[in-house]
Amino acid sequence: MSKDEEKEMSNDRYVSPLSERYASREMQYIFSPDKKFRTWRRLWIALAETEKELGLNITDEQIEEMKSHADDINFEVAKEREKVVRHDVMSHVYAYGVQCPKAKGIIHLGATSCYVGDNTDIIIMAEALKLVRTKLVNVIAELAKFAEEQKNQPTLAFTHFQPAQPTTVGKRATLWMQEFEMDLEDLEYVLGSLKLLGSKGTTGTQASFLELFDGDQETIDKIDPMIAEKMGFKACYPVSGQTYSRKVDTRVLNVLAGIAASAHKFSNDIRLLQHLKEIEEPFEKTQIGSSAMAYKRNPMRSERIASLSRYVMIDALNPAITSATQWFERTLDDSANKRLSVPEGFLAIDGILDLCLNVVDGLVVYPKVIEKRLMSELPFMATENIMMDAVKAGGDRQELHERIRELSMEAGRNVKEKGLDNNLLELIAADPAFNLTLEDLQKTMKPEKYVGRASEQVDAYLKNVIRPLLEKNKEILGVKAEINV
């Protein structure tokens, strides 16, 4: 087929946006047919080696023949065979046997389809989780850098998206960071607990191996541990039906959903801050925000994070429902759903983390805008301190509290109804009950006096939690994201 024909075919078929627009080539390869079927062959080799080492009549020559064709998969032979037998595993057993005539008779010996299918799924999920882990650690590293840089920048905090006691930009970043750190804990736990299915037969009883090994229970007990070791795992699940428990997929996708929730919260905050013109995500010189409104600088990357995150959070329902509805030792209604939900969950979270890396690395902070908004609200925040100063000057606390309430309401009406600046300080200075000058009041208008321990909390969190985490993972730091659109 010519390149023009290939291009034409690609334009008249549906192509998943996850592959075309969002996920990295690295993650796409993990879920590619090439990766899948190479892993099948590695598993068949591991099984043959195990069976030989445990006494079955399998030769070194047969195993070497299998190894020599582990990576050159004859896809077309398998595809044509599947048209005849309607079974993907047996099609690839046949194709492998075509390349390995001496080993043909011992390929897949004693195994079921789930031996290659399910073990491969776990191997691929483990590899995909490692890639997610790498990117997640780098997102945390970028947020740590941002928090350190901005730890002393006072900013108006919001509760209910209404002005609240000030914090710092860096302290706010630690809130995003802590959620990603929690996700990393969950990921490492689930990744560390993954085991292989092993080779347990059609209903998990290893009946076929009783026949192969003449009922030798001690020998059969060695099969799964040996396969696990050859494939780089510590163990196999001790019991199973035909498949590994679909609860495993639920745990894995719940980790992805947790990351998606953290990313969504982060992206929402950036979108709101960009509306306030306090912080912006990166915006290229040639980037277009709107086809009609040329002045627009839309937070489209943060919006895309939110969009993909919703997909991942909903996608996590799929394995949960699949796990809940499996009958007895296995039903096949897991298969089609699993082929979609697991890869697409990983491809989407990969795109999300690339976007997070890109956004955090290029965040633009506008201190003057932040200061202007903070100073417009600070007189309200400072009223308690003002009242204390007035009491020291001889005032009555209860009377002063009522006067501040009344003057605050008046200043609020001036802002909301008349569009004026906040003149609360002027109103207080003009009220003889306070016995304070405007100069006295303006001395209290120092934002750093109202941020509490925000800066110190950033220092402590970075020192005690984040820097040890990054030191532990220093070999995977330095990843930069590339986004396609």
Q: Could you tell me what each predicted segment is?
A:
Residues 86-89, 136, 140-143, 147, ...:
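Alpha-helical transition-metal enzyme core signature, strongest for iron centers
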Residues 225-242:
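A short, charged helix-loop
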Residues 243-278, 287-348:
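A conserved active-site cap/scaffold subdomain adjacent to cofactor or substrate pockets
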Residues 280, 403-410:
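Active/binding-pocket-proximal capping segment
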